[in-house]
Amino acid sequence: MEVVIKISTTEAKKYLLIDTSVLPDVFEEVIQVKELLRSAKVKDITEAVKKVGISRSTYYKYKDYVFNVSDGLKSQKVTISILIEHRRGTLSEVLDKLAQRCCNILTINQDIPINNTANVNITFDISGISGDVKNIVEELKKIKNVLKVEIVAME
């Protein structure tokens, strides 16, 4: 099992990926408690910590600092803003290109076309993509009737 430990500094948060074989068991036990609570296999924290065998104070001490790798790294999201000409099939081509690169579309928001252009914001999961985001953006820019592509946010 791999665990991410959050180490706080005064300037910014710093994360490390550490193999659990070198960590005290308490970190894995905190993860087990969090899993029991998340899956509703127990009714409260008291029951979860008893089942795992740690104290409530130990759980509270580490709960905000220890995460399973899947909690923080499984999904990576990108939001892009695209300015397109109001022409039939343009958005469809954009979506096809994203699908070809194994992007999982999460949201699409298209404004009403004004002066024959429309702004489209697309958020997609990139955890399974082929290639990198910069290449995908460059490919989208090459699509006919796509005027502008920008990365708005990346998580």
Swiss-Prot record:
Which CDD domains does the entry mention? ACT_PheB-BS (cd04888)
Q: Where is the signal peptide?
A: none
Give the superkingdom in one word.
Bacteria
Give all residue intervals belonging to the ACT domain.
Answer: 79-154
Entries under Pfam families matching the protein: ACT_4
Q: Which SUPFAM superfamilies match?
A: ACT-like
**Record family assignment:** Belongs to the UPF0735 family.
Q: What protein does this entry describe?
A: UPF0735 ACT domain-containing protein CA_C1234
Q: Which organism is it from?
A: Clostridium acetobutylicum (strain ATCC 824 / DSM 792 / JCM 1419 / IAM 19013 / LMG 5710 / NBRC 13948 / NRRL B-527 / VKM B-1787 / 2291 / W)
